[in-house]
Curated annotation (Swiss-Prot):
Main localization of the protein described in the UniProt heading: cytoplasm
Pathway: Purine metabolism; IMP biosynthesis via de novo pathway; 5-amino-1-(5-phospho-D-ribosyl)imidazole from N(2)-formyl-N(1)-(5-phospho-D-ribosyl)glycinamide: step 1/2
Active site residues per record: C86, H203, E205
Subunit and partners: Part of the FGAM synthase complex composed of 1 PurL, 1 PurQ and 2 PurS subunits.
GO cellular component: cytoplasm
Function per UniProt: Part of the phosphoribosylformylglycinamidine synthase complex involved in the purines biosynthetic pathway. Catalyzes the ATP-dependent conversion of formylglycinamide ribonucleotide (FGAR) and glutamine to yield formylglycinamidine ribonucleotide (FGAM) and glutamate. The FGAM synthase complex is composed of three subunits. PurQ produces an ammonia molecule by converting glutamine to glutamate. PurL transfers the ammonia molecule to FGAR to form FGAM in an ATP-dependent manner.
Record organism: Moorella thermoacetica (strain ATCC 39073 / JCM 9320)
Protein name: Phosphoribosylformylglycinamidine synthase subunit PurQ
MF (Gene Ontology): ATP binding; glutaminase activity; phosphoribosylformylglycinamidine synthase activity
Length: 236
């Protein structure tokens, strides 16, 4: 399987993602520069965390207009797998590949900590190694991770099982106390209706080896590989 990690000016998690995919999982992975205009030949694209273009205007607002983004949008709309992590999630929202918007954390502070996430849907290319309802530990590091969507959009996300991760307590209770940023419904990650584009604020690449304090992130990335190697394709 061949991955492309897109590097924007200000990205700072691209090397971690590259290491997790290449060195930990042994996959073929390349860096793609924001100025590239083609993503041909890749099976999965990853938009990593960081502060693309300094987060000026809004997080992800300028990156959405980078030269590579039309190719990313076409890739996603043709069924290609896309994972946006933290700033990558924000870019996917700005690009219209996922519904909703990101606001500043409700506490108005940058939050860097481990979080517990409840897996709400494991029937996706990104979560098939997890059990539905399983609690996983994946860290966050963001100042604008407060996900918002209007009531109609939230109802659609619920009805279509597009909410993939919710912040929760260690025993799986979805409570306000477990919510680090004020996200509506404790939402930590969502998928598009077609099931091929996932955006999440927590960083799976930061917990891909036990030496980092946990390996739940490895299971997410390995889910993509397993799904691909089984020959599964969305809409097939």
């Amino acid at each position: 399987m061949k991955f492309g990690v897109i590097v924007f000016p200000g990205s700072n998690c691209d090397q971690d993602v590259h290491y997790a995919l290449g060195s930990v999982l042994g996959q073929n992975v390349d860096y793609l520069w924001h100025g590239d205009t083609s993503v041909s030949g890749y099976d999965c694209l990853i938009l990593p965390g960081g502060f693309s273009y300094g987060d000026y205007l809004r997080a992800g607002a300028i990156a959405r207009f980078a030269p590579i983004m039309p190719a990313v949008i076409d890739f996603a709309r043709s069924g290609g797998l896309v994972l946006g992590i933290c700033n990558g999630f924000q870019i996917l929202l700005e690009a219209g590949l996922l519904p909703g918007a990101m606001m500043r954390n409700a506490c108005l502070q940058f939050r860097c900590q481990w979080t517990c996430l409840k897996v709400d849907n494991n029937a996706t290319p990104f979560t098939n190694r997890f059990r539905e309802g399983q609690v996983v530990r994946i860290p966050i590091a963001h100042g604008e991770g407060n996900y918002y969507a209007d009531a109609a959009t939230l109802a659609q996300l619920e009805a279509n099982r597009q909410i993939i991760f919710r912040y929760c307590s260690p025993d799986g209770e979805v409570t306000p106390a477990a919510n680090p940023n004020g996200s509506v419904g404790n939402i930590a990650g969502i998928i598009n209706r077609e099931g091929n584009v996932l955006g999440m604020m927590p960083h799976p690449e930061r917990c891909a080896e036990g030496i980092l304090g946990g390996s739940d992130g490895r299971e997410l990335l390995a889910s993509i590989v397993d799904w691909w190697e089984r020959g599964e394709r969305l809409g097939a």
